[in-house]
Regions:
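Long, charge-rich, low-complexity alpha-helical segments
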Residues: 15, 20-56, 99-161
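Long, low-complexity, charged/polar intrinsically disordered regions in eukaryotic proteins
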Residues: 42-99
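Short alpha-helix
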Residues: 1-11
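Acidic/polar loop patches that form or flank catalytic/metal-binding clefts of enzymes
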Residues: 9-16, 62-64
Length: 161
């Protein structure tokens, strides 16, 4: 953090924030600064070899991209159809990252969303194309959005149609 600070930058977020999530090990002590919680989670996990994050100029101070407006283009890492089939069949999505494991339980309707994640259409377009009620779609997407914490989902307009 001192290197960023010296360069006039601040950390906007980590590429895989789940690595720095202290709640995987213990409750965050009251008053503990976030930088210390990240360092403690890192020490407890023992799996972080390289830190990868997003830096912005201090004057910008913004967080990760928000999907709330619907204009973001989600990009899924991996084979979207394979993920869709697995979710349709089991309603579960196993998550693994350098010794960190979890399982996301999802309604089988989520498979339609995974199938539509082509890296070209915005969330609003995907929602309209799936035929899922807009309120239900947003509720369901809120359950999928944490995939970005695992490095399995990001937002990009590079391939936008």
């Amino acid at each position: 953090m001192s290197l960023l600070d010296a360069g006039g930058l601040s950390l906007s977020g980590f590429c895989q924030p789940v690595r720095y999530d202290l709640s995987r090990f213990a409750a965050r002590p009251d008053g503990m600064p976030r930088e210390e919680t990240w360092a403690l989670a890192e020490a407890l996990s023992g799996t972080i070899k390289t830190h990868v994050g997003y830096a912005v100029h201090k004057s910008e101070s913004r967080g990760p991209a928000s999907w709330a407006t619907g204009d973001k283009v989600p990009v899924l890492q991996g084979d979207r159809q394979q993920v869709a089939r697995a979710v349709a069949k089991t309603g579960r999505l196993p998550l693994k990252l350098d010794g960190i494991s979890a399982e996301m339980r999802l309604p089988k309707d989520a498979a339609r969303i995974f199938s539509a994640l082509d890296g070209r259409r915005s969330l609003a377009e995907i929602g309209a194309g799936t035929g899922i009620d807009p309120v239900a779609f947003r509720t369901l997407w809120a359950r999928l959005a944490p995939l970005s914490d695992w490095g399995l989902l990001h937002y990009s307009n590079l391939n936008r149609v």
